[in-house]
Amino acid sequence: MMKEKLFYLLPLLALASCGEPSYKDASLSPERRAELLVKELTLEEKAHLMMDGSRSVERLGIKPYNWWNEALHGVARAGLATVFPQPIGMAASFNPEMVYEVFNAVSDEARAKNTYYASQDSRERYQGLTMWTPTVNIYRDPRWGRGIETYGEDPYLTSRMGVMVVKGLQGPADGKYDKLHACAKHFAVHSGPEWNRHSFNAENIKPRDLYETYLPPF
């Protein structure tokens, strides 16, 4: 009788072992599931996921994704959206709480747009949930054309505004999931010139200025 039970039980155990992989186990924490998923990736697959346009990994159920999305004063380049004042204008309000409310609204719109595009199986640039926002570089030289993206020349004000932007975009710290993922840019001494920003080395910045002015917002 015991042998007969084992005869029927062993195939069931074998089927159970061939079930959903552990990284799809919803009872595990997101951190643990991510850790398990990364272990399944090959080196080449990991490298492709580091690009702003990530390829799909079909064997693991990972869909393509574009990390390049912007929301400096509203959801950018993804159809109609609410347009708020430029960051330099919001900084002039000296009102961090208002900035939080602005980006809380922005995150709502971004999620709605992402839901729509995903329903159309579209995952192009500017349709995702990872925002290259806020710009917390220090605006010292008015010749820098991107100064309007910043919160001005003061590191303290820039820091306070930057914190509220991130909180508004990502949602409550104790939430189960982030609404969006914010990315403060451009680390660290990026305040012009623009044309050679990928090769320019700001060697004239003194250590004290670096740590007291440019790094605090990050």
Language-model segment annotations:
Residues 18-218:
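Glycoside hydrolase catalytic-domain context in secreted enzymes
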Residues 3-11:
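Sec-dependent signal peptide recognition
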Residues 1-4, 18:
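A broad helix-preferring feature
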Residues 11-18:
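Hydrophobic h-region of N-terminal signal peptides that target proteins for export
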